[in-house]
């Protein structure tokens, strides 16, 4: 006790008793505090355990619009928009399979939700998924951020739910109507903004020969080629793909996916 309160002679026996009593009271206070705190700490642990687990955030990707292929050398990216369609998507899938080509399917959310078996078939065949919004509004770039938010993320959920959990890896704005906000939003949710270099113009109603000629003439523009499997009668698209894919191989092209 001398070390804490001075000399033992100053306090004598009384000082010793007081010191012991003080120490005992202090010890009881510590024990009491520990006992009182224990239930609260346990309750906090239980409450934390009861909180729903937060889903892991998808790793963000580059927000710039990609055109390049992930395959080195002379390579093309085949992209298919506006489906899935119960008539034309299976036919497009068959042509791709016959030619050993993988593609990226840019799907409209409600179409994916309406045809989940087709979405799963696309994934099972080794193709990749792309978000093409809920309503395919080509004036997206003139709409407010909250509208773009719903269009992009609601479609993403519809497609992934239909796919059984497969990830949507790209976002293509309808008509190319990207904004800085939509590109960053998509990228923050793991979807690389996806452009195109070659527009087959198959949606304009031209002949198969016109589609072929357009694609052949524009391949020098870059590797990402745009076709459609939804939004109308795509018989000409299917036939054009049947002709173009073997021709592309004869020209020495390989096939990859857009870079992530």
Which residues does each PLM region occupy?
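Short histidine/acidic/glycine/proline-rich micro-motifs that form metal-
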Residues: 109-112, 135-138, 174-177, 199-202, ...
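Active-site beta->alpha N-cap acidic-glycine motif
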Residues: 50-143, 147, 151-158, 168
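CE4/NodB-like, metal-dependent polysaccharide N-deacetylase domain
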Residues: 93-104, 128, 145-176, 184-187, ...
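Signal peptide-directed secreted proteins
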Residues: 205-256
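Stable alpha-helical elements in mature extracytoplasmic
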Residues: 88-92, 115-118, 148-151, 155, ...
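A cross-family glycoside hydrolase active-site/sugar-binding cleft signature
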Residues: 79, 104-108, 130-132, 172-174, ...
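N-terminal pre-catalytic segment of deacetylase/amide-hydrolase enzymes
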Residues: 2-78, 85-98, 120, 243-246, ...
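His/Asp/Glu-enriched short active-site or ligand-binding loop at hydrolase and phosphoryl-transfer sites
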Residues: 177-218, 252-260
């Amino acid at each position: 006790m001398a070390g804490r309160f001075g000399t033992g002679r100053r306090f004598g026996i009384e000082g010793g008793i007081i010191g012991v009593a003080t120490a005992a009271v202090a010890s009881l206070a510590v024990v009491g505090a520990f006992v009182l705190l224990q239930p609260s700490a346990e309750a906090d642990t239980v409450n934390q355990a009861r909180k729903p687990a937060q889903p892991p955030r998808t790793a963000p990707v580059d927000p710039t619009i990609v055109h390049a292929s992930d395959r080195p050398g002379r390579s093309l990216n085949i992209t298919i928009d506006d489906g899935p369609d119960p008539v034309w998507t299976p036919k497009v899938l068959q042509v791709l399979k016959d030619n050993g080509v993988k593609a990226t399917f840019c799907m409209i959310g409600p179409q994916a939700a309406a045809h989940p078996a087709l979405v799963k078939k696309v994934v099972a065949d080794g193709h990749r998924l792309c978000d093409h919004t809920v309503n395919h509004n080509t004036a997206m770039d003139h709409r407010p951020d909250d509208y773009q938010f719903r269009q992009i993320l609601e479609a993403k959920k519809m497609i992934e739910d239909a796919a059984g959990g497969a990830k949507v890896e790209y976002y293509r704005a309808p008509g190319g109507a990207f904004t800085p906000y939509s590109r960053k939003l998509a990228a923050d949710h793991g979807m690389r903004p996806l452009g195109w270099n070659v527009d087959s113009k198959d949606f304009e109603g031209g002949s198969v020969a016109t589609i072929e000629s357009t694609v052949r003439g524009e391949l020098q523009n870059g590797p990402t080629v745009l076709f459609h499997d939804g939004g109308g009668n795509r018989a000409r698209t299917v036939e054009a793909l049947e002709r173009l894919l073997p021709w592309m191989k004869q020209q020495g092209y390989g096939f990859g996916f857009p870079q992530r």
